[in-house]
Amino acid sequence: MFTESMLFLLLFLLLGLIAKNNSLIIAVAVVILLKLFHVDGKVMEMVQAKGINWGVTIITVAILIPIATGQIGFKDLIDSFKSAAGWIGLGAGIAVSILAKKGVSYMAVDPQVTVSLVFGTILAVVLFRGIAAGPVIAAGIAYMAMQLVAFIK
């Protein structure tokens, strides 16, 4: 039961509890349960291979909800391009999408980088209360760019 991988997962669970990060706690708990119940290796491989896409899909659904509920309409889209923040947001979204595509390709060529990415992501989640998400990164880049624009003015 206490294999190296289980100890590693328990360490991440402890870090999640210390940092009070529910996302990390839930993710680690799910993986531990999959491991404890000896879920088939094919299921684990499928989750590993497709999990990122599932996560992006869920985030995309959450982003589209304000459009579906009428909170955001065409007027808001048009108005967004009347400000520097709107254009920077568009550019940040495009840049992050391109970077993500390149990152996925790079991970396929050099899978060893995945270990560092996983560890770095978990460190950022625990130490800096970061969030492991893609579109949120685009918003963060847009925020940083807007801070730069405000500083230059």
From Swiss-Prot:
This is UPF0756 membrane protein lwe1581. HAMAP family: UPF0756. Belongs to the UPF0756 family. The chain crosses the membrane at residues 6-26, 54-74, 80-100, 117-137. The keyword Transmembrane helix applies. It comes from the Bacteria. It is found in: Cell membrane. InterPro entries: UPF0756_TM. PANTHER family: UPF0756 MEMBRANE PROTEIN YEAL. The keyword Magnesium does not apply. Pfam families: DUF441 (PF04284). It is a multi-pass membrane protein. GO terms for cellular component: plasma membrane. Keywords: Cell membrane, Membrane, Transmembrane, Transmembrane helix.
